[in-house]
Structure formats: structure tokens, C-alpha cells
Amino acid sequence: MARALVNVPAKVKRGDVVEIKVLISHPMETGFRPDPNGKFYPRDILKSFACTYDSEPVFSAELFPAVSANPFLSFTVVATQTGVLTFSWTDDKDQTQVQTAKIEVE
């Protein structure tokens, strides 16, 4: 599966619009590229990404083969309360990976 680098500010003020950045380390192999032997690499893409803020959905995206390797996603949320951001992504094999980050609101 993939690893992710998540950038979430540790402390913010209530009502601030916060930019969340996620870089997912993943090959996003389309299945159309030949290997050195002329066979095709098997398809291996992430098909969806979602983020929740204290269990409330705040962002979601469908990913397609045209998305480059190591997808970078950036979106904003309004900081309303101290809580946990939960990031999840699912690949072609329906394997889901989850990562969390805490955000503290002053």
C-alpha cells in the first residue's frame, strides 16, 4: 500500500481557514506501460481519497489512471474545534489505508 506525508498545523485559531496538504507515495501504475521484457506492469492505482474532521466529511476525491505517481492533494477546512482529521485512501484491490492527524484549536 501507500505511505502519506500529511501537513496539518498543530495549533490554529477558531474560525481560521486551514490548508491541509497530503502527499501520497504511490506508483499510480496504469497497466498500459510495458516493462523491459515487453509485458505490461499490472494496474495499481488509488481510486479514492477522503478526509473527515471529527467524523464529519470535509473532502473527498475520485482518482483515475491519469493522476500522476505520488498524488498531491491540497484542500482547506474551517477550524471549529480541537479534533482529529482522518485521511483514508483506497486502491484498485479495495485495500484501504487510514492515517490521522490532530489539530488543536485555541
Segments and roles (model prediction):
Residues 4-10, 14-63, 68:
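Contiguous segments within soluble domain cores/interaction surfaces
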Residues 17, 80-84:
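Extracellular Ig-like/FN3 beta-sandwich strand-entry sites
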Residues 71-75:
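Short strand-edge motifs at loop-to-beta-strand transitions and within beta-strands
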Residues 76-79, 95:
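Short, charge-rich binding segments
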Residues 83-91:
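Short, aromatic- and glycine-rich surface loops/edge beta-strands on solvent-exposed regions
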Residues 91-99:
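Short acidic/polar inter-strand loop motif in beta-rich domains
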Residues 102-106:
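Short beta-strand edge segments in extracellular beta-sheet folds
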